[in-house]
């Protein structure tokens, strides 16, 4: 896996200076797992965090589009990632878009082996309003989560549990 020379220079600078609070623009300290990100389109915007304590990285729309009332669209970001093995990228809504505009994000799982365009399925819940997305708008966020690997084993019977087969509201309201 090859890291872009500009990113290597940024990492080196941060390690040498230990500067974190006075970095310009969207340059953040490199203190986590490196996740290589590739622009599939020169117009794409790389994911960013507004604050160091934010859980997710904002994802940006690659192009202008309009979502009709009670409709959904797949929005391209123009980027791909090499998420490390043992992790997954989860696509989540941005709370402001949901609250202010009724725009939701359908669940997305970006597996470590996926190398294509990270697309976001946006849903407009408004009955009468169209929603316009502009190129460069923040449309969702990606959160990285460590995952465990399991081996599924077929059995004839499962151990009993207190809940049993109760589901879909069986635990009360």
Region locations from a protein language model:
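DUTPase catalytic domain/fold
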Residues: 1-173
